[in-house]
Amino acid sequence: MKKGLFIVFEGGEGTGKTTAIDAIYDWITENNFECIKTREPGGIKISEQIRQVILSKDNKEMDAKTEALLYAAARRQHLVEKVIPALNQGVIVLCDRFIDSSLAYQGYARNLGIEEVLSINKFAIGEYMPDISVLFDLDPKIGLARIANNDCREVNRLDIEKLEFHERVREGYDIVYKNNNHRIVKIDANNTKENVINQIKNILRPKIWTNIK
């Protein structure tokens, strides 16, 4: 049996990742591939509990290093409990965020250093990296406006950061992308939902049909 595919969706707040994952999941399963969708931090009981600590608006005093370590801990447990077993069974895994989020948010936007945060996460995940990461690129002003207009979304601690923080997140993602463009594909998220989904399908189609079928 062939190993599955680990596909990650990355981007700032309000870029449309979650909506896109739902649509891509439907597309993949309609084509008779076995697929699961999951998220970070979260996806399993322990990591969801860590998520509540990280994202709670009550924890405004959280230190940046504490934040980075909590993300890495949640990532480790999610990886070994959910992602690796699925990949070993030949399943396509769609994950909302992975290591690149930590590099952009904590490494760059929080000024901890991309290499330092990479080191923490390498300890957590070992050699497990995404087969492909889709980076949703969007002006943070547009992303935050989308969040403000979305009554269904629960606002978390990162959502209420100042615009300057979100601009640094975007800059951080751009650095990570340039250093990893062998596995990261950037798309323009300032488009219609249909256009964004079609961009992703065109990126993933050859990868899925070549490696799984």
Swiss-Prot record:
GO molecular function annotations of the record: ATP binding; dTMP kinase activity
GO biological process: dTDP biosynthetic process; dTTP biosynthetic process; dUDP biosynthetic process
Keywords: ATP-binding, Kinase, Nucleotide biosynthesis, Nucleotide-binding, Transferase
Record field: catalytic activity: dTMP + ATP = dTDP + ADP
EC number(s) given by UniProt: 2.7.4.9
Top-level taxon of origin: Bacteria
Family of this protein: Belongs to the thymidylate kinase family.
NCBIfam families: DTMP_kinase
Protein name: Thymidylate kinase
Organism: Clostridium beijerinckii (strain ATCC 51743 / NCIMB 8052)
Gene: tmk
